[in-house]
């Protein structure tokens, strides 16, 4: 209890006097641990036989840094993240018998997020994210390094409504692409709409005691990962893996004591992609069919840490 109070006081001191740069959007996750399970499904490609399932888990820690001069108010968010993707496949690389194969991929990133106040109602939200994405089965190379970035310009119309437009360069579709972004937020004491397209669309309702939030969530995420060793279920020599999924389903957040939240979601994983690119740039499609999923996570989110959602995706 003493440790939690000390942490809370530190974050509060970072944000006192910066109300012009803090956009009342959503609670900011200082610490987040999450996992998701996707059972095996048949491969969609007609020429391939087998099933593929996934298990994801990750952790992130964010540290705020407040900067204020006589003219400008700036909030920096330093976030370190680790993600782990397990690919569990049963397939035949040739015309022979089925082969069971597990492969683990890792994603380590540092995200520098910035909220800069142009005027009292206009803000610029910037994210810069150098990333290491690899199977870590050989020494790191230049191919293991990625760079992702996004910029949003956000208008706060009033305490409830916010909207914005921007551009991102990221791997959410399983490939490195430039992607236009749109933001729309509406929040009252009983309902919260949080839309950052194409990243997420959340519609959550709040119980009268504010201890339970429930509703629907949709989220798109993906990565491009360097592959350095043999994949037993594929005969080609694979150089790179592209993975993405869109999850849609009901969600519930239980607000626990001392600013901790328990987050649960289930539903369907759709619009999935699993592509293996070999050394000759041929694409081997092993995308599985739509699948149910279940996700669970825990987060630490003090009430006063309410930062623009473009920094908290």
Where on the chain are the PLM-derived regions?
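Repeated loop/turn-to-beta-strand initiation elements of outer-membrane beta-barrel proteins
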Residues: 68-71, 121-124, 159-164, 191-193, ...
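Outer-membrane beta-barrel translocator/channel fold
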Residues: 83-97, 198-294
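Outer-membrane beta-barrel "beta-signal"
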Residues: 182-185, 288-313
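Transmembrane beta-strands of outer-membrane beta-barrel proteins
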Residues: 29-33, 72-80, 124-128, 163-167, ...
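Short glycine/proline- and aromatic-enriched beta-strand/turn motifs that initiate or cap beta-hairpins
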Residues: 26-87, 196, 303
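Transmembrane beta-strands of outer-membrane beta-barrel pores
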Residues: 35-41, 80-88, 130-136, 169-173, ...
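Hydrophobic, lipid-facing positions within transmembrane beta-strands of outer-membrane proteins
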Residues: 55-61, 106-112, 128-132, 145-151, ...
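Residue-level signature of outer-membrane beta-barrel architecture
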Residues: 61-67, 116, 155, 186-188, ...
């Amino acid at each position: 209890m003493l440790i939690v109070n000390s942490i809370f006081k530190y974050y509060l001191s970072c944000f006192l006097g910066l109300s012009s740069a803090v956009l009342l959007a959503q609670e900011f996750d200082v610490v987040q641990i999450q996992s998701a399970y996707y059972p095996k499904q048949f491969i969609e490609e007609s020429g391939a036989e087998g099933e593929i399932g996934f298990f994801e888990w990750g952790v992130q820690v964010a540290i705020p840094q407040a900067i204020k001069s006589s003219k400008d108010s700036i909030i920096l968010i330093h976030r370190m993240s680790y993600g782990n993707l397990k690919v569990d496949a049963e397939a035949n690389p040739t015309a022979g018998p089925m082969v069971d194969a597990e492969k683990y991929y890792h994603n380590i990133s540092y995200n520098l997020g910035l909220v800069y106040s142009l005027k009292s109602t206009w803000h610029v939200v910037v994210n810069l994210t150098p990333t290491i994405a690899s199977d870590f089965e050989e020494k790191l190379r230049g191919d293991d390094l990625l760079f992702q970035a996004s910029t949003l310009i956000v208008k706060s119309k009033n305490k409830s409504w916010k909207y914005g437009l921007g551009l991102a360069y990221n791997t959410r579709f399983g490939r490195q692409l430039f992607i236009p972004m749109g933001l729309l937020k509406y929040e009252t004491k009983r309902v919260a709409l949080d839309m950052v397209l194409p990243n997420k669309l959340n519609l959550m309702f709040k119980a009268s005691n504010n201890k339970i939030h429930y509703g629907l969530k949709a989220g798109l995420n993906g990565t491009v990962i360097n592959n350095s060793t043999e994949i037993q279920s594929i005969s080609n020599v694979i150089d790179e893996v592209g993975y993405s999924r869109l999850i849609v389903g009901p969600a519930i957040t239980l607000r626990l004591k001392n600013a901790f939240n328990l987050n649960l979601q289930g539903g369907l994983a759709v619009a999935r992609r699993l592509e293996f690119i070999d050394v000759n740039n041929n694409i081997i499609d092993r995308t599985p069919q739509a699948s149910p999923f279940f996700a669970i996570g825990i987060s630490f989110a003090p009430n006063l840490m309410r930062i623009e959602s473009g920094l908290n995706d």
